């Protein structure tokens, strides 16, 4: 992209502001003063979300308090709730910097783009699938996991107007959030990667989760296409549906190990194509098929995406393997729910090993009243695993059901888990998987600590 994303004058018009504003170019829209660089538009969001949204990262400070920092870093304009003293760049004053500012600019961004837009959601694998689709030539996609009430509008505001396709990831922290995000994004293709028992504590049932995820179709035009797994119902959507998975419109015909990758042959709605895929978590092929189905639904050439899939690495914390001495460590710590936990354990059980198969697994959060049962039920997925170390209060329900010979230990508080003690339980030729909800291992950087402890013991 050679032309600037916006000018200050264009932003002012998008916000409905009267007056004369300069044609100063803007190359980045951000709400984070630490991310500001020369040519940025700084959006000073409130520390407490407005618009009825909720956030687990609410702040006691408001964005306008960092206006001076943003200007010093190179901001050429800023959206603020009131004029801030000492600021020399244009201040675009609106009553609510989220709804009247960031969301209004996002609507203007979407209105000026006339190419295909793929919106996607799901209980797990959203970001990995988005990264697959983002490799399509000329695509513009959400950075990182920008999938909430500020991440989605930022994605739209920063998307390249000349892109071949926009890719917009959508998540949720409360019921009804996906419907609002999809109505803002107005996708031409909507993808639901999967529906799993995640956020049960917030939504109450798997059916409520299904409804929330399928509500992404509310943003589709009448001729839009909803892309779904083969086993997911969506009676709410009366329009066209394209399905992926075994026996569906888009499915894998074969998957053959080929050195450090898989050679896959797939049927994409009657068109056969071959591609390579880096091995990883069991759902990796599922996500690749979802990406191919979405690209085909958008009227793009899936062959162009297939050529790129083999170059997409595994994202940190989502099944990345590393060998430390004679031990293989599988980092699947980014998140965990009953479906992905079972898949990770089943994959470990099926893996040929010279030593032992070891699982270090932590609590799966936000499962509501059924949480103890979901944890205890994992006992059916460790039959072929030699040792299990449980972390967190909920994992005690599994620990107590384990055969004594499989019990490596149970630690209640993830924050005080000693990586060196876990490392001492491991032996040469062991294959170890680390899996749990984000707050158990990922936030505490446990995998890095365990890797360091193993390296120190070599």
Please report, for each region that a protein language model flagged, where it lies by residue.
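A short helix->loop->beta-strand "cap" motif at the edges of active sites that frequently abuts
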Residues: 73-76, 89, 115, 220-225, ...
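Short internal beta-strands
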Residues: 76-82, 194, 227-230, 358-362, ...
């Amino acid at each position: 992209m050679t032309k600037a994303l916006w000018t200050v004058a264009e932003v002012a018009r998008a916000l409905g502001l009267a007056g004369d504003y300069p044609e100063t170019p803007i190359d980045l829209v951000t709400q984070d003063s630490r991310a500001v660089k020369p040519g940025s538009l700084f959006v000073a969001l409130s520390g407490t979300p407005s618009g009825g949204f909720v956030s687990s990262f609410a702040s006691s400070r408001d964005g306008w308090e960092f206006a001076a920092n943003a200007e010093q870093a190179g901001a050429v304009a800023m959206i603020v709730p009131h004029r801030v003293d000492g600021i020399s760049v244009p201040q675009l004053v609106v009553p609510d910097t989220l709804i009247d500012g960031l969301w209004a600019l996002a609507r203007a961004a979407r209105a000026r783009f006339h190419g295909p837009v793929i919106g996607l959601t799901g209980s797990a694998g959203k970001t990995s699938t988005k990264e697959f689709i983002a490799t399509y030539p000329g695509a513009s996609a959400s950075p990182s996991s920008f999938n909430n009430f500020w991440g989605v509008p930022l994605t739209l505001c920063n998307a390249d107007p000349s892109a071949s396709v926009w890719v917009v990831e959508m998540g949720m922290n409360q019921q009804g959030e996906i419907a609002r995000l999809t109505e803002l994004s107005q996708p031409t293709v909507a993808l639901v990667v999967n529906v799993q028992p995640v956020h049960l504590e917030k939504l109450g049932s798997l059916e409520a989760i299904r409804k929330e995820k399928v509500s992404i179709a509310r943003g589709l035009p009448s001729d839009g296409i909803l892309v779904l797994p083969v086993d997911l119902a969506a009676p709410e959507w009366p329009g066209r549906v394209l399905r992926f998975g075994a026996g569906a419109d888009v499915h894998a015909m074969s998957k053959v190990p080929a050195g450090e990758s898989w050679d896959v042959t797939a049927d994409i709605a009657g068109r056969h194509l071959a591609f390579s895929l880096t091995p990883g978590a069991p759902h990796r092929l599922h996500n690749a098929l979802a990406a191919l189905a979405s690209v085909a639904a958008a009227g793009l050439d899936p062959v162009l995406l297939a050529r790129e899939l083999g170059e997409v690495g595994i994202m940190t914390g989502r099944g990345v393997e590393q060998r430390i001495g004679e031990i293989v460590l599988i980092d699947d710590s980014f998140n965990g729910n009953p479906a992905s936990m079972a898949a990770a354990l089943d994959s470990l059980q099926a893996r040929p090993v010279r030593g032992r198969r070891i699982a270090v697994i932590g609590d799966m959060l936000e499962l509501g009243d059924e949480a103890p049962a979901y944890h205890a039920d994992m006992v059916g997925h460790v039959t072929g695993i030699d040792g299990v170390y449980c972390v967190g209060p909920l994992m005690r329900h599994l620990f107590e059901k384990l055969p004594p010979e499989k019990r490596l230990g149970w630690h209640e508080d993830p924050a005080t888990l000693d990586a060196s003690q876990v490392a001492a339980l491991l032996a040469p030729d062991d294959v170890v998987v680390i899996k749990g909800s984000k707050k158990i291992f990922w936030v505490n950087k446990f995998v890095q600590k365990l890797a360091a402890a193993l390296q120190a013991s070599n």
